[in-house]
Amino acid sequence: MIRTILAPVTGNRPDAAGLGTAFLVAEAFQAHVDALCVTPHPELRAPIEAASIPAPLARRLVALATEEQARAAASARSVFNEISGKHGADPAQRGNEAISSQVTADWRETTGSLSEIVPEEARLADLVVLARDADGENITRAAIETVIFNSGRPLLLAPSGQVSAIGTAPAIAWNGSAVAARAVRAALPFLRRSGKVVILFTDTAEPGRAADPQRLAGYLEWHGITTSIRQATVGHRQVSDALTGSALEAGCDLLIMGG
């Protein structure tokens, strides 16, 4: 069950995509969105060597960085207010009253390293939603990697453009590995809601008892999920590109895979 969704924001372009996806998921599961705005300490925005420039100039640089930090937080808050309002999210409640059939949300702000803060916060969430620009941002990319490897929680990478639904036609990239199995287990709420899934495997997959996609299909049938199996030909492509391409060809809107 998905009840809490952590949606980190930074005041940059990916915020709208990340929050939009988080609220779509929240609507699907009547869940709570925990929007967390993380901005660097002013000293990190304006790295300076104290001995290299006069103190008044150093203070001015930190002041400018502080102003930029405030602008970033205000920008992220504006996007949050717009999207949460569009989805009719109510302020969060606690205790038994929090278990409801409506979307709730709250807003928090903190300063520090995105890649350090988000994995720790993620451990107290059911799902993390992050987005990045098509060209990628180094800070966000680092946060994505640390969430995958250090949080112990599933990560949903939001599409860069606007979408009206997500998880209605899921696919699983299956190779029988432990990380793939954990991804499937974490995605069961999506799979049960959809009731169907495409199982993808590649012609380069290593043989193994659990790697057989038919075995996964049998497991999912116990959860009431209808499956179809599709082979993705790698050829000269990266495995990830082959899987993504095959999922798109099958009309899927969510690809589930291990990190």
Explain the meaning of each model-derived region.
Residues G18, L114, T140-R141, A180-A183, ...:
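Amphipathic coiled-coil/heptad-repeat helices and related helical stalk/stem segments
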